[in-house]
């Protein structure tokens, strides 16, 4: 029987480099940026969750479960991840950011294969050159470790990774899949690229 896999889209940040605009709701070629991410994930997972710390009513319009970080104060992606891990009943949780509209359509399958083959706790995507720290598949039992890490005042996701067995899956065959949008200029460049 195939494992159940849920996904959480992280849209809980403050988006300082986007002028404070909620990145998931920023228009990209006629759709909110998060819609591009949802479209890439909808056939890859059983259920989609959205982590948003503001504008929750707007995120709810897509019909998915929306939740804020359990710990207030914009503590970074780990805070959204640990809350999602505590909510899911799935065998695995896929984590992606809301500002990555070109995710691979085989993301989940390849991360799962890497995790299982290497008997790892989590699998992280790489663009062939750099690891993508917030594009990963992990087991829900890691919630306790992640919560303890946050409770100790830690925030750096790669430091938390080092406590666990990590598989890295290269997507060098799709080098632009993890292009993310942090500034209005990057948004315009990607909008032009998508329109071609």
From Swiss-Prot:
<dbReference type="Pfam" id="PF12804">
    <property type="entry name" value="NTP_transf_3"/>
</dbReference>
<keyword id="KW-0547">Nucleotide-binding</keyword>
<keyword id="KW-0342">GTP-binding</keyword>
<keyword id="KW-0479">Metal-binding</keyword>
<protein>
    <recommendedName>
        <fullName>Molybdenum cofactor guanylyltransferase</fullName>
        <ecNumber>2.7.7.77</ecNumber>
    </recommendedName>
</protein>
<dbReference type="GO" id="GO:0005525">
    <property type="term" value="F:GTP binding"/>
</dbReference>
<dbReference type="GO" id="GO:0061603">
    <property type="term" value="F:molybdenum cofactor guanylyltransferase activity"/>
</dbReference>
<dbReference type="GO" id="GO:0046872">
    <property type="term" value="F:metal ion binding"/>
</dbReference>
<dbReference type="InterPro" id="IPR029044">
    <property type="entry name" value="Nucleotide-diphossugar_trans"/>
</dbReference>
<keyword id="KW-0501">Molybdenum cofactor biosynthesis</keyword>
<keyword id="KW-0808">Transferase</keyword>
<feature type="binding site">
    <location>
        <position position="99"/>
    </location>
    <ligand>
        <name>GTP</name>
    </ligand>
</feature>
<dbReference type="GO" id="GO:0005737">
    <property type="term" value="C:cytoplasm"/>
</dbReference>
<keyword id="KW-0963">Cytoplasm</keyword>
<feature type="binding site">
    <location>
        <begin position="10"/>
        <end position="12"/>
    </location>
    <ligand>
        <name>GTP</name>
    </ligand>
</feature>
<dbReference type="InterPro" id="IPR013482">
    <property type="entry name" value="Molybde_CF_guanTrfase"/>
</dbReference>
<feature type="binding site">
    <location>
        <position position="23"/>
    </location>
    <ligand>
        <name>GTP</name>
    </ligand>
</feature>
<comment type="subunit">
    <text>Monomer.</text>
</comment>
<keyword id="KW-0460">Magnesium</keyword>
<comment type="function">
    <text>Transfers a GMP moiety from GTP to Mo-molybdopterin (Mo-MPT) cofactor (Moco or molybdenum cofactor) to form Mo-molybdopterin guanine dinucleotide (Mo-MGD) cofactor.</text>
</comment>
<comment type="similarity">
    <text>Belongs to the MobA family.</text>
</comment>
<dbReference type="InterPro" id="IPR025877">
    <property type="entry name" value="MobA-like_NTP_Trfase"/>
</dbReference>
<feature type="binding site">
    <location>
        <position position="69"/>
    </location>
    <ligand>
        <name>GTP</name>
    </ligand>
</feature>
<feature type="binding site">
    <location>
        <position position="51"/>
    </location>
    <ligand>
        <name>GTP</name>
    </ligand>
</feature>
<feature type="binding site">
    <location>
        <position position="99"/>
    </location>
    <ligand>
        <name>Mg(2+)</name>
    </ligand>
</feature>
<dbReference type="GO" id="GO:1902758">
    <property type="term" value="P:bis(molybdopterin guanine dinucleotide)molybdenum biosynthetic process"/>
</dbReference>
């Amino acid at each position: 029987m195939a494992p159940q896999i849920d996904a959480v889209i992280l849209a809980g940040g403050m988006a300082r480099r986007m002028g404070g605009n909620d990145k998931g709701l920023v228009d990209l070629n006629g759709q909110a940026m998060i819609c591009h991410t949802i479209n890439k994930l909808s056939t890859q997972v059983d259920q989609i969750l959205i982590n948003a710390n503001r504008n929750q009513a707007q995120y709810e319009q897509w019909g998915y479960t929306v939740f804020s970080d359990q710990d207030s104060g914009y503590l970074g992606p780990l805070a959204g991840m640990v809350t999602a891990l505590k909510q899911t009943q799935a065998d695995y949780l896929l984590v992606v950011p809301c500002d990555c509209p070109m995710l691979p359509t085989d993301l989940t399958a390849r991360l799962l294969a890497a995790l299982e083959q290497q008997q790892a706790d989590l699998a992280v995507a790489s663009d062939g050159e750099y690891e993508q720290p917030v594009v990963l598949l992990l087991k829900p039992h890691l919630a306790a470790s992640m919560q303890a890490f946050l409770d100790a005042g830690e925030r750096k996701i790669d430091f938390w990774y080092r406590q666990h067995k990590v598989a890295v899956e290269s997507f060098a065959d799709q080098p632009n899949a993890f292009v993310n949008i942090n500034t209005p200029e990057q948004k315009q460049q990607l909008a032009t690229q998508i329109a071609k």
